[in-house]
């Protein structure tokens, strides 16, 4: 563009000696110069606009690149949470600290983390016992006994099975005849009511699950809620029994008893 301007100015200088030929030549020169000057100015304006446009595009492009780099370089913080969700401020996966896994010889289950192991042997074939720190009535036991049955269903219905292992329901202190209060019949000092029973299948293995409420004439928190899970494998009867007193059952112990027995399975 600079060379074009020089050529036009040089052409105007050469044409100037012809000024004496008449006013028409002057008018032609004037007319011929102005359009060229206008064109030059217009070209410069276009260049300026192009520079401004390119500058704007460059800024937008640079901003886009910066935003993209920030998006790629940034990492979502584990503390970020969607609306209505609790933020994990420490950035670690949340774990269920109320239970701890226990892997025994041929079985596994979840044990309440605040329960402690106990050496008390309450049943034949008992291989594990845990109890509540504050109330030994809340406890769980695992029994492994030899059997000639091939499946838990060989014991009959869940109720039939329970009648064959009724020692799991415990004993009370008094065995004499009495007319006790609390809804017991004359001469009856204990009762057991099956509240629920089911026959779940876990990994192709049949289980029995039975929930029982036992009550005795000698009291003991108004009764005990006992949950029994059982199955048979390789000539062995596996039983998991957990319980809690009636009062604690409704104050939160139910969750620990039911979760422990429902997690019980044979390897």
From Swiss-Prot:
What cellular component terms from Gene Ontology apply here? chloroplast thylakoid membrane; extrinsic component of membrane; photosystem II oxygen evolving complex
Q: Where are the transmembrane segments?
A: none
Q: Which InterPro entries match?
A: Mog1/PsbP_a/b/a-sand (IPR016123), PsbP_C (IPR002683)
Molecular function in Gene Ontology = calcium ion binding; manganese ion binding
Could you provide one GO biological process annotation from this protein's UniProt record?
Answer: photosynthesis
Is Aminoacyl-tRNA synthetase included in the keywords of this UniProt record? no
Kindly state which keywords UniProt assigns to this record, in alphabetical order.
Chloroplast, Membrane, Photosynthesis, Photosystem II, Plastid, Thylakoid, Transit peptide
Q: Which residues form a coiled coil?
A: none
**Targeting signal (transit peptide) range:** 1-81
Q: What is its main location?
A: plastid
The listed locations are: Plastid, Chloroplast thylakoid membrane
Family membership noted in the UniProt record? Belongs to the PsbP family.
Could you identify this protein by its name? Oxygen-evolving enhancer protein 2, chloroplastic
What is the organism of origin for this protein?
Spinacia oleracea (Spinach)
